[in-house]
């Protein structure tokens, strides 16, 4: 979808070269399209089949030629075909009409639910907000999830890296965050599927419908818009679909003045797509074969994710680390932009501790006394030191048993186990699987609960009372119920 075209639109050019997803196009003298303009081919190939393709201008080569990257497959294109300058960048629909729908990089619906009745469209390329528009005072973004709010709090308008393998609960955590921002913050979410599996994209859509995040009966009551450019798409689509999702999120922030969650899965694929077309665009490869513009490309995307005085975009980005090498230029460049990391741990998931967020590996720049306050900071550090001591003692316990520990260490282990259990929490979006009502826990309740456990006030309660509850009051009530059942 392309915005209303200016007078220069409609200039016809001729395709002179096609190499994979990259086209060289010749235009009449003095009528070259601008960088980032969308070019459109609508014709028939030699077999008589319809060919419809959009490409984005990347370079002006001289001799009245431009080089463009295709947003879909270039099958069927031949030299000499006509291609038209639309006179504007790729534009996508924005606003409430996008909720509950799935779009491709061009803003075209791909969910077979009919056309989108959007009242406005917006170009995917725009500048980051000016410094004068930014909300520079750090503010914690409360998620209602205990382990995140206490140990690795998110910054409103910040960027969070989500690390985790398959099957440890990434999708459920994403769904819960989408649900909580809608209920507690009156906000909406945008999900950008960048270069991941088509099956996962479909599964996510079905799970969103199942959990009520997408209301299939009344799409206007949905809480999320989806924008997909999956693994099977050409690199042009994977390189730009993140910007399409971001543009939809910016409208909710700037026009509707809402708090928005932007999910990008996976930010590494955005970089990978850029590196795929970089050499074809004639650029000299940089370290490990990445594009020389790596820092610029990532920065242009990340700097648009910000908190303004009108609203905020808080971004949660899944980060794939190639060969687990954190020094690889792609993840290393991404880390420079992150305010927090949420690491999901398979060992915790196998114990049944959900969400399986690692309390020791997850980090946040917000966890400092000047931002969160002394009590929150002290409680978080005490929780981490208790869990760290428990981790150190686990080898001794495995070899010699619990009885060989000193009195102090036994007390630490007992409290650490309760803390670990209390870091679990029933989710709203998982109610249909667990049969337990979801819980949103306020930050003050979270801090108070962990303080009571660490102070020894609840040493007399059984461990099981702390598992999959919301606030500490629920743990006490569960303990009474357990005691009554065992009498």
UniProtKB/Swiss-Prot annotation:
It comes from Parasynechococcus marenigrum (strain WH8102). GO terms for cellular component: plasma membrane-derived thylakoid membrane; proton-transporting ATP synthase complex. F-type ATPases have 2 components, CF(1) - the catalytic core - and CF(0) - the membrane proton channel. CF(1) has five subunits: alpha(3), beta(3), gamma(1), delta(1), epsilon(1). CF(0) has four main subunits: a(1), b(1), b'(1) and c(9-12). Keywords: ATP synthesis, ATP-binding, CF(1), Hydrogen ion transport, Ion transport, Membrane, Nucleotide-binding, Thylakoid, Translocase, Transport. Its EC number is 7.1.2.2. Pfam families: ATP-synt_ab (PF00006), ATP-synt_ab_N (PF02874), ATP-synt_VA_C (PF22919). The keyword Nucleotide-binding applies. This is ATP synthase subunit beta. It is found in: Cellular thylakoid membrane. Produces ATP from ADP in the presence of a proton gradient across the membrane. The catalytic sites are hosted primarily by the beta subunits. Belongs to the ATPase alpha/beta chains family.
């Amino acid at each position: 979808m392309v915005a209303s075209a200016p007078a220069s639109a409609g200039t016809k050019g001729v395709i002179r070269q096609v190499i994979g997803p990259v086209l060289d196009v010749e235009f009449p003298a003095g009528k070259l399209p601008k960088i980032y303009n969308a070019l459109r081919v609508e014709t028939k190939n030699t077999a008589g089949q319809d060919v419809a393709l959009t490409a984005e201008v990347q370079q002006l080569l001289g001799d009245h030629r431009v080089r463009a990257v295709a947003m879909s497959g270039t099958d069927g294109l031949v030299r000499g075909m006509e291609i038209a300058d639309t006179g504007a960048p790729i534009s996508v629909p924005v606003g409430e009409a996008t909720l509950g729908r799935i779009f491709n990089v061009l803003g075209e619906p791909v969910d077979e639910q009919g056309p989108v009745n959007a009242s406005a469209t917006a170009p995917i390329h725009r500048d980051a907000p000016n410094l004068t528009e930014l909300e520079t005072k750090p503010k914690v973004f409360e998620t209602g999830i205990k382990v995140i709010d206490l140990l690795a709090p998110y910054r409103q308008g910040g960027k969070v890296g989500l690390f985790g393998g398959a099957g440890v609960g990434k999708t459920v955590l994403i769904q819960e965050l989408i649900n909580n921002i809608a209920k507690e913050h009156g906000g909406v979410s945008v999900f950008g599927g960048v270069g991941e599996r088509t099956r996962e994209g479909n599964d996510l859509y079905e799970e969103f419908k199942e959990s009520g995040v997408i209301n299939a009966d009344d799409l206007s009551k949905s809480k999320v818009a989806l924008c997909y450019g999956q693994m099977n798409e050409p690199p042009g689509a994977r390189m730009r679909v993140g910007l399409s999702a971001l543009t939809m999120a910016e409208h909710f922030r700037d026009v509707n003045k809402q708090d928005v969650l932007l999910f990008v899965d996976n930010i590494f694929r955005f970089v990978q797509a850029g590196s795929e077309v970089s050499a074809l665009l004639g650029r000299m490869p940089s370290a490990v074969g990445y594009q020389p513009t790596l820092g610029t490309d990532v920065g242009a995307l990340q700097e648009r994710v910000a908190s303004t005085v009108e609203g905020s975009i808080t971004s949660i980005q899944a980060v794939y680390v190639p060969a687990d090498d954190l020094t690889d230029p792609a993840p290393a460049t991404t880390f420079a932009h992150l305010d927090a990391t949420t690491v999901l741990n398979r060992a915790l998931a196998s114990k049944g501790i959900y969400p399986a967020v690692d309390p020791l590996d997850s980090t946040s720049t917000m966890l400092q006394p000047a931002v969160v306050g002394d009590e929150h900071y002290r409680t978080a550090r005490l929780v981490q030191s208790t869990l760290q001591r428990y981790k150190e003692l686990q080898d001794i316990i495995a070899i010699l048993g619990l009885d060989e520990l000193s009195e102090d260490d036994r007390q630490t282990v007992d409290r650490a186990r309760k803390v670990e259990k209390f870091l679990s929490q029933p989710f709203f979006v998982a109610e249909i699987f667990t049969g337990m009502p979801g819980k949103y826990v306020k930050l003050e309740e979270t801090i108070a609960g962990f303080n009571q456990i660490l102070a020894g006030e609840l040493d007399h309660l059984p461990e099981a009372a702390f598992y999959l509850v919301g606030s500490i009051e629920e743990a006490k009530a569960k303990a009474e119920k357990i005691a009554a059942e065992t009498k």
